[in-house]
């Protein structure tokens, strides 16, 4: 049999078999074209499940008159010009087959106008002849595409369409997927003249949670964990079903790569593996969005672009796994560590995180301006809204060290009255709590101390503990105590050798010529610090670091360390000071710092007590009374 070239109409119908599977496929291709055109609103109208009519209207950039006919031909696109463009593609469409394929199996009308044109133009194309007629029309800036009588010229394909209800369900499901990815777009859907979906732009987090509730259900929106993680060129964001709310298999499973919805077994495996430590056999719900360098992912794998191929699939898998595990671990810790916010809280606040702590008599210093504060409210707020956040390390609230002023400013009148009340207040006994304590691994040594934690004194101005002894009132700097406790913890662990924590994603940096010699000469010191380094293919691989460096920028910190130890072998005191500086944000509440202080030896406690500053409260009260 002789080889013959297929006629254009037959070739387009064959291509349509891959691209146009059902009405939902048509809507997918047309809406993606609208988004590529920069539309901020997309209106979808269908009749009889899309078999009778599909109309997509947008406010995008439009198509010039001279390009209308070309837009309906095969392999015509404005998305790319060369192979390099394909390797770095970020748009939804790029093959130039959608409009040609749709017009070959339907009666298609394309109306469009650009901002530069004074009038719109309309292109008509029918599947039989593939001839395009261009006529003037009335239309605002943007485009409208109508596909009438889908599969009218391919009866076999039309017979395979399901009921109107089933086809509408497929369309509705696809719209949910794209609405989750493009929160900035206003989507509407009409079926048989009735508006059934109206997704308004979700420009704030609260609005997006509302959209999440519309699409994924109220239960998912109320219990999901916020994911926000960035490492090098990878960024993962979205929402994950809470382990406490997950059960069985969830249909809410959406994964996007650079804004494109894909089906990938890699992410499903990472999610199930992350959940395996809480419950076996759970396939939880998630809405996850991965952003990465387009050169690191191939989207030209499937005709319908449902699949992608990662150049470093194992690296992406481990990255997603670590981000999800960190988010779930943090949510578990927050549920234990953080009490509901009271109406009046101070900057340093007690919480049952490290042991039973007596209630404090808080002093409202809302009018004062402390130089630095440590706010548990901020921690709770950011954790509940942002979940996991970090650049390769675990979530960490920020402790802003208080500045050490040589003089204490005069307190407010409210504080003076509170000082007097403190003197007449009976001591409060330590109360037990039913909340199970689960200290982090790096605090295990601190928790095993034999020293008991006394009741924590009140906190004032977000910076100081108020110490009352007989008729004396003193202020003890919390930041100073936290620093001393941290140094004591490091010193105790350094004496035995700090146990390094392996990085799930090792950090690689270009190696300097003298680094191999430094690592070899200082191997004992690095092992004592819990740091494991290796050199391979001209790269320095950071495999393990002590817990005090987990939140540091290792790519910059480790070279500085190597340069430091190259010149001299530092003393233990210098190493302790350096580690303490890197882990300045160690304690995340006043109660943690107080518990660490209580675990210090008596002589160290006395020395720190001696650094407290006595307040001349009697003089202030006399002056206050004389003023009256």
Curated annotation (Swiss-Prot):
Q: Which domain of life is it from?
A: Bacteria
- What are the recorded GO MF terms, alphabetically? ATP binding; ATP hydrolysis activity; ATP-dependent DNA damage sensor activity; mismatched DNA binding
List the Pfam families hit by this protein, alphabetically: DNA_mis_repair (PF01119), HATPase_c_3 (PF13589), MutL_C (PF08676)
The protein's name: DNA mismatch repair protein MutL
Please report which protein family the annotation says this sequence is part of.
Answer: Belongs to the DNA mismatch repair MutL/HexB family.
| Skewed-composition ranges (Polar residues) | 343-353
Listed HAMAP family: DNA_mis_repair
Cross-referenced Gene3D superfamilies, in alphabetical order? 3.30.230.10, Histidine kinase-like ATPase, C-terminal domain, MutL, C-terminal domain, regulatory subdomain
A GO cellular component term found in this entry reads:
mismatch repair complex
Functionally, this protein is described as follows: This protein is involved in the repair of mismatches in DNA. It is required for dam-dependent methyl-directed DNA mismatch repair. May act as a 'molecular matchmaker', a protein that promotes the formation of a stable complex between two or more DNA-binding proteins in an ATP-dependent manner without itself being part of a final effector complex.
- State the InterPro entries in the record: DNA_mismatch_repair_CS, DNA_mismatch_repair_MutL, DNA_mismatch_S5_2-like, HATPase_C_sf, MutL/Mlh/PMS, MutL/Mlh/Pms-like, MutL_C, MutL_C_regsub
Q: Name one GO biological process term.
A: mismatch repair
Q: Does the keyword Lipoprotein apply?
A: no
* Swiss-Prot/TrEMBL keywords: DNA damage, DNA repair
